[in-house]
Amino acid sequence: ADLNLVKDDAGATVVPGNNLTYTLAVANAGPSDAAALSVTDTIPAGLGFVSATGAGWACGQAAGVVTCTRPTLAVGAAPAITLVVSVPANYAGANPILNSATVGSSTADPTPGDNTDGESTPVGAGSADLAIVKDDGGASVVPGNNVTYALDVTNLGPSDASTVSVTDAVPAGLGFVSATGAGWTCGEAAGVVTCTRATLAVGPAPSISVVFSVPASYTG
């Protein structure tokens, strides 16, 4: 049974935080049926297993190796196997991602050289959708007191964000008091408050608290 395998990523470029899908196409060029087929695929370092499915295939994953089996394959093509792996939002591994799969059976194969096929998938630049909400808690401020704002930043993904910066101009007539937030480095210069952090994973960041003073003589 002359088996062959073709692995295809559909020309994808994967962005950290997303999944990468492979199609594994197995065929038997004969002349005999193949028995006890097994397709193996080692997940590349840094990636995670999501799923492996295919009609008539029994698939599973253990210790980073995906295995799909079927008892027999007549001459012709088998239903394709769809393998999905996850690329973490903070992926910093090999680029491109190299991955190969191999098919074998208990039936002698006269040309085993086409039983393995690989793909090289480029990793694109990360993409991070940042959002910010500014809230004064519904406060009414009295001249001579302070006004406090909460700045809530969220990374909607799919990738981690790097070199994150939040800026907030001090309103005319008000004074800067403080700006604090866990993991943030904050300061004020020339009437602009700036808070920075090196990275932000997908999800919310600790809130920033910005305090301005409203002078007793305020008439703005």
Identify the role of each PLM range:
Residues 1-220:
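Exported/extracytosolic protein signature
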